[in-house]
Amino acid sequence: NPTQGVKPEDMIRHLMGEDLKVGCCLTWGPCFDFQKRFFTGDVAEQSLYPYTLRYDVEVSGFGSHMSGHLNLLNLEDQIYPGGESKEHWPTLGLNTLRWAKKQGAICGPAHSSIGLTNFIGRLENTEAQDGENNLPNFQIPAFDGIGANEFIVDVTHQIPGPTGELIPAVDFISTMNTERVAEWNMWYHVLNCGFRVAACGETDFPCMSGERVGIGRVYAKVDGPLTFEKWIQSIAKGRSYVSDGYCHLLD
């Protein structure tokens, strides 16, 4: 890995090489104080339409990261009030979400299945109730990692949005870059409980997946010319689907 991260002029070339129209480059714990200079609260000037690059934040190596890493997209401000770096952030993910959603961010957990693949048992009286291909299943995860751990609590909350209206604390669950049965199982159970949360494609490059960007992709329906704002709002509204990019043509 680069010692201080990948610069925007390099990241836009990765997007173009994989024909990704939109890429979110997330500043995280290691090298945060170097990478934070690339955040502008808008698309990066290196973007070459339709290839659009934007810098935002993954809460990883921060105060609340043990509750599960969070992807905070479409931020206006990248640093939680009270400091200039990453050490002073809340220890509870929901408090980070309250701050992010107040400024109009679209949020969800990163690398969701980390912490969901070790089991401590299963729900009683659920034998023979697992679905086809083990989806959904009723194994109880240990929640012992940095994925969608606090997610199942946060998804039940509504918190104030930019104008004070109550909106969902979580917009999506990240998928496609970690163990997929565990990712989809969490999503299925949340949907079955009545919470409408989108699935979002993810590639944790170059930390977890050094092969290439675009291993997990999210395709969003937008009206008119593509912009980052239209794309991210379509994901929040569920006007999207995920794919690995190999079979994505729909009529």
Describe the role of every protein-language-model region:
Residues 1-251:
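Extended, charged catalytic domains and RNA/DNA-binding interfaces, predominantly
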